[in-house]
From Swiss-Prot:
GO terms for cellular component: DNA-directed RNA polymerase complex. The gene is yonO. Keywords: DNA-directed RNA polymerase, Magnesium, Manganese, Metal-binding, Nucleotidyltransferase, Transcription, Transferase. Mg(2+) binds at D535, D537, D539. Belongs to the YRH RNA polymerase family. Its cofactor is Mg(2+); Mn(2+). GO terms for molecular function: DNA-directed RNA polymerase activity; metal ion binding. The keyword DNA repair does not apply. Induction: No expression under phage non-inducing conditions; induced by mitomycin C (at protein level). This is DNA-directed RNA polymerase YonO. Its EC number is 2.7.7.6. Signal peptide: none annotated.
Length: 839
């Protein structure tokens, strides 16, 4: 999809700083003294013989300095000022294009100071800047939002007050904090996450808001056998219960004329998945065209030309608007923007993870070898099989976000024989072995696809008013057009309890007519959403049709039913600086990974207790919601004792590969399912074979006679050495190093303002000396190298013998001049020898 590709190719750059950037001079002096003391303490630790009094002195000095620093924080009562010396190149991060960057008009590839990210190390300073804001360049900045991802890393987003004043209505569709507070406030962390919707990496979506409505969700009671956990006593009771399930939780519909593919959407206060479903055809079939929106107003979907139906679960702040017309009017008045993201792409190959594998506890060695065979084959073929090498390098037509190097490999595969490409493959192989030993296994025909509800059942409720709709899918059947009729295993991450949704994939013409996407559609009579813990706002499932895995999953799911317990409701509060600060500090204290790791300890132990895992799964979900609900169940003493007894061990041995743990911090290897992979996955060194024609670097040059330029080469070496310092952001993803390479490119162009010249100089320098490390060249000038290759392939050919570029005199020409002459001489010698022998 062009829009998606454009959205994920565009980036802007902003500063990401930490709370030390707001120190006053006294605090900064104390901070530097503490750092100096830490360095001295580290120096003492390296010495063999140190007088105890030195250790005692430095420890007490650090404690004393910290106390002085905290006192200085408390003494500071003015608005804080950003220290300009903190705005360094290594504090720049890259953001993908989003509603926020588009609304603010931040130009692509520019460095903007409209917004800044602040990471918290000292809570007193966070409290100050949330309460009073901060000053930079005579502009006041105020707290804007913190997304779920930012909360996990104690980060917050701040915005220029003048910018917020200008664009606030466009970002909030005219819904002010004052208006929310006048109606009783909101859950702070929910409000935070809804404000952060504008931050999502996305592409622009031209939505006609007048052709959209919002209706009530489809909720029904589903009768099911469950393990009911009493959240007060922790007692687990297996019984049949009527479970309320909101089948359309986060999901809406659009006419297929708008899009044949599902995608996620973002509008102010609106998020979720839109699935193409022809609700007009449904209305015409039943001659019923009137639907009610969430406010009770009736709409004729034909006369009103309704093309999109959102659900109440998608419209997060619907209660704060007077009507849907109120929202539509403000959306247009303030120039609000729509966005689309994650358009479905089932071509992405799926992989099993350790969480999915570890719950298959009775798997045999032979079965595990079979399941691992595709991964083992790919690892062993790396270096000798061209297709495998191209695939792991991402040089495939399926890859929609190809880099210049990946594009170049597709048109000039001889690059596979270059040392730089070989180095990438070597590192890729190490990574593949590590991944495989930690449970990431390739499975034939495994695909990721969206989880979709039975929208036919939704229309039966919406258009026909049927309280207990039947829908198209009956029982626990599912429909996914990617697979033939038969059993499939539906999986979702995180996978904590035994959560293999083995279901019958039903195929018929009626399903194909209504369910037009490759998503997996689930029945409204099936509690599968409780088993797999999903909603339908864009959650993806991994679908596996492999018969062996499906049968193993079936075997392990015998006697497993969904877990059920009553969750708490989010608490409303007034949105103000004090409550925002308190909500953030609560959220910062949550460690969801701890529960996941403790559950993994039990699955990989020699004594698996399902009840303990059930309790931990429940606690995990309460922990996730804690920042919103402020409720956490209290363990009874006997339960606490039992849980602690089971989680006292270290994490499993495979965490050396899965989480980079040291040998001393993991358990000894045992016979658990994932640990067994250690002996199945090969770790032998890579051996390269010539898999394509001979490589000639001159195909990468525009000017074949280019002379080396020492000034350019020396500056390149200096910048290449220093790029690690520039790439300071621990979270920066491979696609987010753009700013660093932008700086390097600018510095090189200051020496010689001709990027074609610089590219040729660097290509000749790096490829002639057979450097293994050419990433900076490809990141900075890869587009020019790619154009050079394209041009040269039209003009030159690679000699079939030596690989060198030559200008062919005819289409049949295969050899360069010297090899051609040698070939002719050899041919003549052979002919003469044959003639003499014949005589």
């Amino acid at each position: 999809m062009k829009g998606k590709k454009d959205g994920l190719n565009k980036q802007v750059h902003i500063y990401s700083i930490d709370t030390s950037a707001f120190y006053n001079d006294q605090e900064n002096k104390l901070h530097n003294k503490i750092l100096k003391s830490y360095r001295y303490r580290d120096h003492l630790r390296k010495l063999e013989h140190v007088d105890k009094k030195h250790k005692k002195y430095i420890t007490q000095r650090i404690i004393s300095l910290k106390e002085k620093l905290y006192n200085a924080f408390n003494d500071h009562n003015q608005i804080r000022t950003l220290r300009t010396d903190s705005l360094k190149d290594n504090n720049v991060i890259s953001l993908f294009d989003s509603v926020l960057t588009r609304t603010l008009g931040i130009k692509e590839n520019s460095l903007s100071e409209e917004i800044m990210v602040v990471q918290t190390y000292h809570f007193q300073i966070l409290r100050d800047i949330i309460d009073k804001g901060f000053i930079h360049n005579n502009e006041k900045y105020v707290y804007f939002t913190s997304s779920a991802g930012q909360i996990r890393t104690k980060k917050s987003c701040f915005i220029k007050q003048s910018t917020l004043d200008k664009y606030q209505n466009a970002l909030t569709c005219g819904l002010s904090v004052e208006h929310i507070n006048a109606q009783g406030g909101s859950s702070i962390n929910k409000w935070n996450s809804y404000m952060a919707l504008s931050n999502s990496a996305s592409s622009s979506w031209e939505i006609d808001i007048d052709k959209a409505i919002v209706v009530n969700d489809l909720e029904t009671n589903v009768s099911s056998l469950v393990d009911y956990i009493d959240r007060d006593t922790y007692e687990i009771t297996r019984k049949i219960m009527d479970i309320p399930i909101e089948h359309t939780d986060g999901c809406g519909m659009m006419l297929p004329s708008l899009s044949q593919k599902s995608f996620m959407v973002r509008l102010p206060w609106v998020k979720g998945l839109l699935v193409p479903f022809d609700f007009r055809k449904f209305a015409e079939k039943h001659s019923s065209f009137i639907v009610k929106d969430v406010y009770g107003k009736e709409w004729d979907i034909i006369k009103d030309d309704i093309q999109i139906i959102f659900t109440k679960s998608q419209f997060k702040m619907w209660k704060y608007y007077d009507s849907w017309d109120d929202y539509r009017y403000k959306f247009k008045k303030y120039g609000c923007l729509g966005a689309k993201l994650n358009e479905e792409d089932p071509s992405v190959e799926g992989k099993l993870t350790y969480q999915m594998l570890q719950t298959l506890t009775d798997i045999t060695d032979e079965e595990l070898k079979q399941i691992s065979s595709k991964t083992v084959s790919e690892i062993t073929q790396l270096g000798t099989d061209k297709e495998t090498m191209m695939k792991v390098l991402g040089a495939t037509e399926k890859n929609k976000h190809k880099t210049s190097l990946q594009e170049a490999l597709l048109i000039y595969p001889e690059l596979l024989n270059d040392d730089h490409t070989k180095e990438i493959i070597k590192n890729k192989k190490k990574s593949m072995i590590k991944d495989a030993k930690s449970g990431k296994l390739l499975v034939s025909d495994a695909r990721y696809t969206y989880l979709c509800p039975d929208l036919y059942a939704f229309c039966e409720r919406l258009f026909l008013g049927i309280e207990s709709p039947k829908g198209l899918l009956s029982g626990s059947d599912v429909h996914c057009s990617l697979y033939d009729e038969g059993y499939i295993d539906i999986l979702r991450s995180p996978h904590l309890f035994r959560e293999h949704g083995v279901r019958w994939n039903k195929k018929n013409e009626e399903y194909e007519k209504w369910f037009i996407t490759p998503g997996v559609y689930t029945s409204i009579h099936d509690p599968i959403s409780k088993l797999l813990q999903f909603d339908n706002d864009g959650d993806k499932a991994l679908i596996i049709s492999d018969e062996l895995i499906v049968n193993i999953a079936k075997r392990n799911m015998a006697d497993i039913v969904p877990l059920y317990y009553e969750m708490s409701v989010a608490q409303k509060q007034e949105i103000n600086s004090r409550n925002i600060y308190e909500a953030l500090t609560l959220a910062y204290g949550i460690n969801i990974g701890e529960y996941s790791n403790n559950i993994t300890k039990i699955w990989n132990s020699d004594n698996i207790n399902l009840d303990v895992i059930k309790w931990l799964c429940m606690e995990n979900n309460f922990t996730i919601d804690f920042a919103k609900t402020l409720f956490m169940p209290t363990r009874p003493d006997h339960v606490d004792e039992k849980i602690k007894d089971y989680i006292k061990n270290k994490v499993p041995h495979f965490f050396i590969n899965a989480k980079d743990k040291e040998e001393h911090s993991v358990e000894s290897i045992n016979e658990s399912t994932v640990n067994k992979l250690d002996s199945i996955i090969p770790s032998d060194r890579i051996n390269f074979a010539a898999v394509a024609g001979k490589f000639d670097y001159r195909f990468l040059l525009k000017n074949k006679e280019i002379k080396l330029n020492e000034a350019v080469i020396n500056e390149y070496k200096r910048l290449d050495r220093n790029k690690k310092w520039l790439m300071n952001d621990e979270e920066a993803k491979p696609g987010q190093k753009l700013y660093v390479y932008k700086i390097i490119k600018q510095k090189l162009l200051e020496i010689h303002n001709d990027d074609g010249f610089i590219t040729d100089v660097l290509v000749k320098h790096l490829y002639k000396k057979k450097s293994k490390y050419k990433s900076t060249l490809w990141e900075c000038f890869g587009d020019i190298v790619l154009e050079n290759i394209k041009h040269n392939l039209k003009t030159f050919k690679g000699c079939c013998i030596c690989g060198k570029a030559f200008k062919p005199t005819s289409n049949k020409a295969k050899y360069c001049q010297s090899c051609g002459k040698k070939k002719e001489r050899d041919k003549y010698k052979k002919y003469n020898k044959k003639r003499i022998n014949h005589r």
